[in-house]
């Protein structure tokens, strides 16, 4: 789907989020699967070439982030089959043979900017979190059991836990371009 199509879907779904007492939260994942496969646990999947796929209507509650699904939008990059991370100093990371592509990363940032604009929420780490960041807050992330470390890094040699900040920075950049700043 095109970015314009995605924005229309967001506009249509926005009223359904008014029933929740808190502002929408957006959780950013990878599928831990292969390129060109989408999963119904996420509202939006982004393929290796940057294609946006609606895999679950935004009006439905996803099954993507433990205890954080109600009133949320779940987005996943289709990648990272076989990815591994080992706690150490520094962490040992291998994003597998299908790591996040540049096209996926840039499309995700553009999707984040669109959500921010249409839902009128800031691009910050309260409203846009990687699954690694959310899992750390809930005790099952990289700093504890390391069950979920989605997008802790975007490239094998990135600084550990830099993925969320990188994505938010890119999303702000795309938002400023759209606003003509």
Describe every region a protein language model picked out.
Residues 1-69:
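N-terminal catalytic cores of peptidoglycan-degrading enzymes
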Residues 1-20, 83-181:
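Basic/polar, cationic surfaces and motifs that engage anionic cell-wall
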Residues 25, 72-74, 127-129:
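Structural preference for beta-strand elements that scaffold enzyme active sites
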Residues 33, 49, 80, 113, ...:
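Residue-level marker of positions within ordered structural domains that often coincide
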Residues 45-103:
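Peptidoglycan-targeting cell-wall enzymes and recognition modules
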């Amino acid at each position: 789907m095109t970015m314009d199509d995605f924005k229309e879907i967001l506009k249509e779904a926005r009223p359904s989020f008014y029933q929740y007492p808190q502002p929408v939260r957006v959780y950013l994942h990878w599928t831990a699967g292969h390129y060109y496969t989408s999963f119904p646990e996420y509202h939006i999947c982004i393929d290796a070439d940057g294609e946006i796929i609606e895999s679950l209507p935004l009006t439905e509650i996803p099954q993507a982030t433990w205890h954080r699904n109600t009133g949320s939008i779940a987005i996943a990059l289709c990648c990272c089959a076989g990815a591994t991370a080992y706690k150490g100093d520094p962490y040992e990371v291998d994003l597998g043979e299908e790591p996040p592509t540049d096209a996926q990363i840039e499309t995700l940032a553009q999707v984040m900017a669109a959500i921010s604009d249409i839902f009128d929420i800031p691009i910050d780490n309260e409203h846009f979190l990687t699954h690694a960041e959310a899992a750390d807050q809930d005790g099952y992330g990289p700093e504890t059991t390391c069950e979920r470390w989605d997008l802790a890094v975007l490239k094998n040699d990135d600084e550990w836990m830099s993925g969320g900040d990188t994505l938010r920075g890119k999303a702000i950049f795309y938002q400023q371009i759209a606003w003509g700043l």
